């Protein structure tokens, strides 16, 4: 399992991304379409935003264990937890393949 501090860090990043999403999108739009002077100012303001408010810095982690690798997006858990939950019948509609 991942350390609690790593899980907390990811939660904090998610909150920052949500908080600054609109502001970041507006500034990026100005950088793309504005005249050079406005674009430069918008780029400066983008750099002043917190680093962790950038969605690129987020990493998918298992909701149960915090494991960063082997993440299954559709279910939000790692492959290990997915297999365990599917075997126990905790995920509706999932069963072992047979052909």
From Swiss-Prot:
GO cellular component: cytoplasm; small ribosomal subunit
Stored Pfam families: Ribosomal_S14
Tagged with keyword rRNA processing: no
Keyword tRNA processing: no
InterPro entries: Ribosomal_uS14, Ribosomal_uS14_bac/plastid, Ribosomal_uS14_CS
Keywords, comma-separated and alphabetical: Ribonucleoprotein, Ribosomal protein, RNA-binding, rRNA-binding
GO molecular function annotation: rRNA binding; structural constituent of ribosome
Domain of life, source organism: Bacteria
GO biological process, one term: translation
Family: Belongs to the universal ribosomal protein uS14 family.
Subunit and interaction comment: Part of the 30S ribosomal subunit. Contacts proteins S3 and S10.
Functional note: Binds 16S rRNA, required for the assembly of 30S particles and may also be responsible for determining the conformation of the 16S rRNA at the A site.
Name by which UniProt lists this protein: Small ribosomal subunit protein uS14
Gene: rpsN
